[in-house]
């Protein structure tokens, strides 16, 4: 079973519009073992309502160690369509604000689409849409 550890959000101000930008860091566990993390960011812009996200799947050479040895990063966008359906798209690495990750590689879309961790990444995004209240409240506002 997947569980997400929710850190407090950080906030900055958007240089182009002056609106608040939300930055999230989350840690993902499966059966009480750390397996991944994700970063997410979003702001209120008149022309877009999407969350940019980077999911990092961690690998360990030594399972007894607390420190991972490799990360594979999957850049993506999360959004809701006109029918209120949750959507996820894998992106190229230059389409998200994170340029690199410690001990890892951020994949471009084509490489991510064919990567063996792709299904695990989409499983994590299901949980993001179900559990991450910051993202849920942004994408599904209660007006």
Predicted features, each with a name:
Residues 1-2:
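Short Cys/His-rich Zn2+-coordinating modules
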Residues 35-124:
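Acidic, low-complexity, intrinsically disordered interaction modules
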Residues 11:
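Residues immediately within or flanking Cys/His clusters that coordinate Zn2+
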Residues 14, 27-28, 128:
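Short aromatic-centered micro-motifs
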Residues 23-24:
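Short, non-ligating residues that shape and space the ligands of small metal-coordination modules
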Residues 118-143:
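Acidic, proline/glycine-rich low-complexity IDRs
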């Amino acid at each position: 079973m997947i569980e997400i550890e929710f850190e407090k959000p950080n906030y900055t101000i958007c240089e182009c519009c002056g609106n608040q930008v939300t930055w999230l860091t989350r840690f993902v566990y499966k059966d009480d073992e750390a397996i991944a993390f994700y970063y997410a960011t979003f702001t209120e812009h008149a022309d877009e309502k999407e969350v940019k996200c980077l999911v990092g799947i961690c690998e360990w050479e030594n399972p007894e160690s607390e420190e991972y040895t490799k990360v594979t990063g999957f850049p993506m966008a999360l959004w809701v369509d006109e029918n209120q359906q949750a959507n996820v798209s894998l992106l190229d690495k230059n389409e998200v604000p994170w340029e690199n990750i410690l001990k890892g590689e951020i994949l471009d879309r084509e490489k991510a689409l064919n990567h063996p961790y792709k299904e695990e990444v989409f499983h994590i995004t299901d949980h993001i849409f179900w559990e991450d209240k910051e993202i849920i409240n942004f994408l599904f506002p209660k007006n």
